[in-house]
Amino acid sequence: MAPGEKIKAKIKKNLPVTGPQAPTIKELMRWYCLNTNTHGCRRIVVSRGRLRRLLWIGFTLTAVALILWQCALLVFSFYTVSVSIKVHFRKLDFPAVTICNINPYKYSTVRHLLADLEQETREALKSLYGFPESRKRREAESWSSISEGKQPRFSHRIPLLIFDQDEKGKARDFFTGRKRKVGGSIIHKASNVMHIESKQVVGFQLNFTLFHHPMHGNCYTFNNRENETILSTSMGGSEYGLQVILYINEEEYNPFLVSSTGAKVIIHRQDEYPFVEDVGTEIETAMVTSIGMHLTESFKLSEPYSQCTEDGSDVPIRNIYNAAYSLQICLHSCFQTKMVEKCGCAQYSQPLPPAANYCNYQQHPNWMYCYYQLHRAFVQEELGCQSVCKEACSFKEWTLTTSLAQWPSVVSEKWLLPVLTWDQGRQVNKKLNKTDLAKLLIFYKDLNQRSIMESPANSIEMLLSNFGGQLGLWMSCSVVCVIEIIEVFFIDFFSIIARRQWQKAKEWWARKQAPPCPEAPRSPQGQDNPALDIDDDLPTFNSALHLPPALGTQVPGTPPPKYNTLRLERAFSNQLTDTQMLDEL
C-alpha cells in the first residue's frame, strides 16, 4: 500500500463515524437521539445534569409504555371482530299470515274407521282404572267378548301390550297375558282425509291460499307469495289490519287426536315455510284475539364476525323444503335426512327427501321405535345437526303483542250468532254456538320498521388512525418518525451487529486458513534510537509522541567510522608555518 493511502486509512480510522455507519450501537443511539424528530429522546442527550437526564429518561420510557399498552388494546379490539349496531325506522309491507285449525280431520269423516279403536279403548280403560260399578261386576263384564270367542278386529291387527319398567324389551299381552319380545312400537296408519273449514274475511275481500300441513290438515295463508302483488297497509292500528272470523266447528273435533279447541296462527315472510307446530300462536274460541305486530329486520355480518350463512349454500344439509333457508328448515331437513339413513324411511310430518319413502308398518314395522331413538339423540344434540346448521345472516322477526276479549258478548250474541248463521247459508246446517267461532285481528301497531345492521367496529383505516393518534399524543410522532424508528432500530441496529459478527468471522477464518509463519527476524535499529522500527511511512507527530525514549546506557555495537571529509583543516596552515620559518631565518 502506498504511503498516501495508508495515511488516509489511518485518518479515516481515527475520525469519529456516526449515523447508520457507526461502528457501535452506542454511537448509533447517540446519533439517533440528536437527530430524531421525537422530543423525548433528544432531551435525554442534550440535557445537562444527572437529575434532569433521569427525569427525561423516565418520561420517555413511560410514554413508550403507554404507547405499547394503547396499541395493544387497539390490536386486541381489532381482532375481537366486534360490531356496532345502527337502528333505522321505515315502513314495510304486510307479512304473510297462515291460519290452521287445531283439529286436522273431521271426526264424522273418520269415525267409522275408529269405531273398533273407540270400543276397545273404553273397555281397556274400564278394566285398567275401573268405574263406579262393583269390582265383581267389572270382572264379570271384562272382556266378555273374548269368552264368547269374539276377537276384536283392531286388537287382531295391533296388539295391546303392557310394558314393565323392570323387563326391558318384553311386554305382556293385555288379553291373553302372554309375554312377547318387542323390538318397536306400532300405530295405525293415518288416513288421507282432509277437512276444509269455512272462512270469513272482514275488511279484506281477498282469497286465501290453501296450504296443507301434515299435522294440522288444511291451512290458509293470507298475502302469500303466489299473489300477484304483496299487500301493504297505509296506517297502523286494529282498524287497518287483517280481520278474520274463524268457524272452528267444535263438534267435529277428534277426541283421539286433540284435547284442546281453537286455531293456530303464524306470521312469517312470503318465502318462508310456516312452522305452525313450533312457533304458532293459539287462538281461543268465543274470544277476540288482537295481535299487534312490530317488525324487526336484522342484517348480520358473515365470517369472521359471526357464524351465519347468506343463503345456506355453505351448509352441508340439503334443503328439502320449497322455501328460503332458515335455521329451522336446516334442522328439520337434517333430522329427516338422518331418519332416512338410519331408519330406512321418512317421517310423515316433514317433506319427503329424494329417492325416499314415508314410513309404514308393512314395510318398516319398527320405524316408530327408531324414530323415538333418533328424536332423543336429536334433542340431546348427538346427531350433529345443531353444530352443522347455521343461522341466516338476514332475517325478519315480528314481535307480537296479544290481547284477548270475550266475543261475542252476552248482549250481542243474541243477534250476532243468527246473522253469522244466515251468512254461512248452506255450509252450516245448525245454529252456530259461540264456542264454534273465534275472531282474529292482526295489525301493525305502527308502520315503523326497526332495522338492525351490523358493521365492523374496527377496520384497517380506523386501526391506523388510532395508532397515529396514540403516537402523536404521547411522543409527537408522525409517519416520518415511525419510518425513522424502523430504519434505526430494525435496520441499522441489526446491520451493525451483523457487520461486527461478519468481521469477526472473517478474521477467525483468516487466522484458521493462514499457514504458521516462522519467527520474524529482529528488525534493524537505528544508531541514535534503537527502539524505532524502520517503516515505509513517514513519521507523524502522533506516532512520535507514542515512541519510547532512547536508552542512554546502550552502546552501539561498532564505533563510528573515521571520515577524512569530516576533518577540518585550515588551508593556510602550511603557509603560516612557512612564514614563521622564514621569520626565524
From Swiss-Prot:
Belongs to the amiloride-sensitive sodium channel (TC 1.A.6) family. SCNN1G subfamily. It comes from Pan troglodytes. Its main location: membrane. GO terms for biological process: sodium ion transmembrane transport. Keywords: Cell membrane, Disulfide bond, Glycoprotein, Ion channel, Ion transport, Membrane, Phosphoprotein, Sodium, Sodium channel, Sodium transport, Transmembrane, Transmembrane helix, Transport, Ubl conjugation. This is Epithelial sodium channel subunit gamma. NCBIfam families: ENaC (TIGR00859). Residues 1-55, 499-585 are cytoplasmic. The chain crosses the membrane at residues 56-76, 478-498. Residues 513-534 are annotated as: Disordered. Originally identified and characterized by its inhibition by the diuretic drug amiloride. The record marks 138-139, 181-182 as: Cleavage. It catalyses: Na(+)(in) = Na(+)(out).
